[in-house]
């Protein structure tokens, strides 16, 4: 089994290669051994809100899936990182791309998020074998569950994505 490293960073961008406008994790409240809690405030100016739907804007469901995926990526980078020297600011630095989405097992929408809403994103690691990680996620808006899912992420050689 490969050596795994734990990393703790002050900036969300140090965990993920995503950058605005597609970085959907605004802040991280906590990281434990098998879970992460993060937040996102729905920005009325974001590219995916302006056209979904003019005059009655709601956050697209695909963005909620992506929020949980990014939170899962944070957990992998934080606790299950096979790289001691991890740098998300240079796209060619890391030998592996961590937390690449390979499967959405299920997703269930139970409500809407609108511009200005602050979303709580909770993702828990259910299992992992090697570089394959199974998660479930919950997103809440005003303490109401609006999305839940199960998904799988994996680590791939970085050159696969080039």
Describe the predicted segments one by one.
Residues 9-19, 91-96:
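Short aromatic-glycine motifs in intrinsically disordered, low-complexity regions
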Residues 1-16, 52-58, 83:
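Mixed-charge, low-complexity intrinsically disordered regions
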Residues 2-4, 17, 35, 112-162:
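HotDog/MaoC-like acyl-thioester-processing domains
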Residues 63-71:
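Short amphipathic alpha-helical face segments that pack within enzyme cores
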Residues 2-6, 73-120, 146, 153:
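Hydrophobic beta-strand-centered segment that forms part of the acyl-chain substrate-binding groove
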Residues 18-59, 63-64, 77:
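Catalytic strand-loop segment that frames the active site of acyl-thioester-processing enzymes
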Residues 26-30, 106, 150:
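Extracellular/lumenal ectodomain signal focusing on beta-strand-rich modules
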């Amino acid at each position: 089994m490969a050596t795994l490293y734990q990393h703790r960073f002050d900036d969300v961008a140090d965990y993920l290669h995503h950058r605005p406008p597609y970085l959907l994790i605004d802040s991280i409240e906590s990281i434990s051994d098998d879970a992460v809690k993060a937040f996102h405030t729905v920005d009325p100016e974001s590219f995916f809100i302006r056209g979904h739907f003019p005059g009655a804007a709601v956050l697209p469901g695909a963005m909620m899936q992506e929020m949980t995926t990014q939170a899962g990526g944070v957990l992998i980078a934080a606790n299950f990182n096979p790289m001691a020297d991890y740098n998300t600011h240079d796209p060619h630095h890391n030998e592996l791309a961590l937390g690449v989405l390979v499967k959405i097992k299920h997703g269930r929408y139970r409500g809407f998020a609108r511009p200005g809403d602050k979303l709580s994103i909770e993702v828990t690691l259910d299992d992992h074998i090697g570089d394959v990680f199974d998660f479930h996620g919950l997103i809440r808006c005003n303490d109401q569950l609006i999305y839940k899912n199960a998904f799988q992420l994996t680590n791939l050689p970085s050159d696969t994505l080039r």
